[in-house]
């Protein structure tokens, strides 16, 4: 299915319920539909660079829109959490984050030469005994056992070299990306390992103290966030 009714879009999509009856879906890719927006919707309804999909196809085909430093030409390409959209011709860049309601929003950045934050979802051993790090945005890079599952990496884009390694440990700063505290940030106070089928949990101290499941937590820094979290929101 390439389109869905506007009224049935995922709750994470911050789009009006009024307007065209049908709206594009995301194509299968690095992010799930629930955690991403189609690039065509972003350039038309969010950034308002075009008025319709025909104009959108044209500017994408001309390489005027980059996602994580790579020209993307598919209107249905999924743009997800922490992805960076760059518009070289107007020297602007935006990062996809979540608001307090768990909706995906674009924050305008002060510069276009920025890095990307990713979480290590798991690790696998590949040919030659090398360690492959499988990241939350679908990226796979070679690493070592020094990197742990649920650690975060700051990557340069588009070449994806590791700029900084952030450990998933007590004392580091984290963002919550799911549940009732989605979009909140704070310091990791405790990681509680549960020896059962239930999820491990994490105690976070931010504006309030709260507990959330481990899978919802992404480390974003040590003493301070490694990525810009605030700024102008594009709506």
UniProtKB/Swiss-Prot annotation:
SUPFAM superfamilies, A to Z: Alpha-L RNA-binding motif
GO molecular function, one term: rRNA binding
Organism of provenance: Methanosarcina mazei (strain ATCC BAA-159 / DSM 3647 / Goe1 / Go1 / JCM 11833 / OCM 88) (Methanosarcina frisia)
One Pfam family in the UniProt entry: Ribosomal_S4e
Similarity remark: Belongs to the eukaryotic ribosomal protein eS4 family.
Keyword GTP-binding set for record: no
Disulfide bonds: none
UniProt entry keywords in alphabetical sequence: Ribonucleoprotein, Ribosomal protein, RNA-binding, rRNA-binding
Gene Ontology biological-process annotations: translation
GO cellular component, one term: cytosolic small ribosomal subunit
Protein's recorded name: Small ribosomal subunit protein eS4
Domain S4 RNA-binding: start-end pairs: 37-110
Taxonomy of the source species: Archaea, Methanobacteriati, Methanobacteriota, Stenosarchaea group, Methanomicrobia
CDD domains xrefs: KOW_RPS4
Top-level lineage group: Archaea
InterPro entries: KOW (IPR005824), Rib_uL2_dom2 (IPR014722), Ribosomal_eS4 (IPR000876), Ribosomal_eS4_central_region (IPR013845), Ribosomal_eS4_central_sf (IPR038237), Ribosomal_eS4_KOW (IPR041982), Ribosomal_eS4_N (IPR013843), Ribosomal_eS4_N_CS (IPR018199)
């Amino acid at each position: 299915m390439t389109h869905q009714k506007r009224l049935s879009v995922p709750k994470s999509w911050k789009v009006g319920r009024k307007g065209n009856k049908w709206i594009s879906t995301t194509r299968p890719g690095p992010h799930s539909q629930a955690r991403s927006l189609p690039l065509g919707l972003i350039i038309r309804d969010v950034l308002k660079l075009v008025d319709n999909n025909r104009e959108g196809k044209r500017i994408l085909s001309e390489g005027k829109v980059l996602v994580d430093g790579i020209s993307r030409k598919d209107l249905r390409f999924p743009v997800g959490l922490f992805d960076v959209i760059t518009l070289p011709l107007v020297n602007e860049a935006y990062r996809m984050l979540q608001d307090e309601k768990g909706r995906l929003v674009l924050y305008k950045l002060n510069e276009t030469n920025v890095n990307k934050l990713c979480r290590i979802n798991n690790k696998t051993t590949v040919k030659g005994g090398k360690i492959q790090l499988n990241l939350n945005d679908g990226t796979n890079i070679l690493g070592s056992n020094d990197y742990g599952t649920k650690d975060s990496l700051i990557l340069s884009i588009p070449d994806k070299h590791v700029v900084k390694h952030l450990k998933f440990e007590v004392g580091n700063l984290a963002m919550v990306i799911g549940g009732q505290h989605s979009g909140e940030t704070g310091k990791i106070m405790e990681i509680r390992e549960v020896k059962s089928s239930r999820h491990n949990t994490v105690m976070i101290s931010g504006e309030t103290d709260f507990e959330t499941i481990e899978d919802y937590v992404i480390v974003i820094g040590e003493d301070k966030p490694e990525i810009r979290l605030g700024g102008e929101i594009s709506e």
